Amino acid sequence: MPMSGIDAKKIRTRHFREAKVNGQKVSVLTSYDALSARIFDEAGVDMLLVGDSAANVVLGRDTTLSITLDEMIVLAKAVTIATKRALVVVDLPFGTYEVSPNQAVESAIRIMRETGAAAVKIEGGVEIAQTIRRIVDAGIPVVGHIGYTPQSEHSLGGHVVQGRGASSGKLIADARAVEQAGAFAVVLEMVPAEAAREVTEDLSITTIGIGAGNGTDGQVLVWQDAFGLNRGKKPRFVREYATLGDSLHDAAQAYIADIHAGTFPGEAESF
């Protein structure tokens, strides 16, 4: 059961609105496989996000733009199979919703039907509001994503903080558009803490921050960053709670050494 936050045996979208009203923070982690999903679910995380970040941390690619809907569905199936309590949300990957609202609805329907997820996430603000509304009208819950949107990295000029200065007005407009379109939550990525706090106070839906300070209703991190499986350079907004990469490296070396020494398998591991 969770240490705090949403108190429910099975989390639904309505629980996020209730948590905001009650001033309860919500926790979100990414997951792309059954083993991590089961562990995080049992730990009490409120939402599991099958993010297109899998392109980077699972498939080893430089950008999220290349991951396909078919690949996302395979990963999401594994997560939903292992999850009993947390709400599972799946990213709509690049190229699956931009052409038209109809394309977006068809992609979202595939995700819901083939994975058993509870919602989809889509990047964009004012320009994507009509698409969000169409997905919601099809009976599919939506999480928005504004601020820095990784699928737009080239048009944004790279990994750049959004919502500073004059652009803060756009952030508010995007947030309101996402809410009015029917999303039940919105991710705020790489925006100034004060701007994220203002958006959070302005909206009635849940805000989930990543690199957006602690004034949002909840937080999300890529688990390989948060728990140190990724041994490379990490974003400034990541707090490392474990060093799993180093632990795995040391364990692999110990395994190799035992094989070379002829001590594995021993009597205890033999029939």
Swiss-Prot record:
One of its GO terms (biological process) is pantothenate biosynthetic process. One of its GO terms (cellular component) is cytoplasm. CDD domains: KPHMT-like (cd06557). The active site is at residue 189. 3-methyl-2-oxobutanoate binds at residues 52-53, 91, 121. InterPro entries: Pantoate_hydroxy_MeTrfase, Pyrv/PenolPyrv_kinase-like_dom, Pyrv_kinase-like_dom_sf. Its EC number is 2.1.2.11. SUPFAM superfamilies: Phosphoenolpyruvate/pyruvate domain. Pfam families: Pantoate_transf (PF02548). Its cofactor is Mg(2+). Pathway: Cofactor biosynthesis; (R)-pantothenate biosynthesis; (R)-pantoate from 3-methyl-2-oxobutanoate: step 1/2. One of its GO terms (molecular function) is magnesium ion binding. Catalyzes the reversible reaction in which hydroxymethyl group from 5,10-methylenetetrahydrofolate is transferred onto alpha-ketoisovalerate to form ketopantoate. Belongs to the PanB family. This is 3-methyl-2-oxobutanoate hydroxymethyltransferase. It comes from Corynebacterium glutamicum (strain R).
